[in-house]
Amino acid sequence: MIYEFGQRLRAALADTGSGVALVCWGLPAGMPVDAEAMTGAVAAMGPWEAMPARDPGMPRILSGVCGGVTTGEPLVLGLTGGSAPAPEGLLPFRPSENDLGLWAKWGGGVRRPDACRTMALLAALGGICRAALAGLGIVMGTHIAQCGDVRDAELPECDVDELRAQLSGLEGRVLPMTDSEGAEELRALLEEAHEGGDTLGGTLETAVVCLPAGLGRPDACGVEASLARNLFALPGVKGVEFGMGFGFAYLCGSEANDQLVAEEGSIGTKSNLSGGADGGLTNGMPLIFRTVFRPAPAVAATQQTVDPVTLEERALTAEGPYDTAAFCRARGAVEGVTAAVLLDLLLERRADRWPCGRGDGEAR
């Protein structure tokens, strides 16, 4: 499985049967590596008490780091223990999994990537990249914007200081929401679904503060395109939108434009409907986007499927435990690919050594 974060950073996921590794190429020599940030990003995927078999464990740095900084060689992160072995023969297709597509493309006996282990390795890489960005003054955070009828309070899209404070307040929360009452409602909703052997989908909203203007490219490798491409590679993602996103369909151009203002020697905008990016380039405002995750397909209820050998319809019941809130665990992976994509765009300015240049654009 290959992840191309941009023009320079690439990563490959390799499953050897005895372990899983993520190899990342393109990191500059001398970039500080915060091991605590890496482990913290993975730990935030928990707790795993209700489903210990899905606990991916803690990744380790195998190579590419010496003395707390990158060497310029590929960074290798590893997890002990392999994924489930490839099944012998064809099994009934699981509804809304990619079993049917894998069978149509490669036939039987394909090893299915473990979503939790994939997420853990991406979260680990993201923890390293995110800490490096923080050293440049770039801060990011993610909250649960919606699950069912439960909605969190909206983020202050233009007030950088207030937004930074709210993002900081999300750290360490099992249910990262700014509205404490909403968090309790969500907790009750998750408990109800868990007791019924069901799963829930949700929307994660990510904000990045203090990005310089002009980061990205005005083409298919722009900041929105690069982020969307990598976010859609995460298990369960079904939608990505920036700023107003699909809400732009309800607006006229005169309502949808972010009008420019001059403040204290820098250029900003009165609003942030575009979500901090226009035409593939950042505009200096906070970068804000939402990622929608479908409910995990494995549920206690009996589902209808088709036996690939006999082509007969049959009933299928998935074995538990069931991942009721898979979207909550995905926060680290979302921030992981976000940090990797943004780091790649920064490296375009000065790719050979750390720190990479901030450019001439001033962030608000």
Which residue ranges define each predicted feature?
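Generic N-terminal targeting/processing segments that precede catalytic cores or assembly contacts
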Residues: 1-364
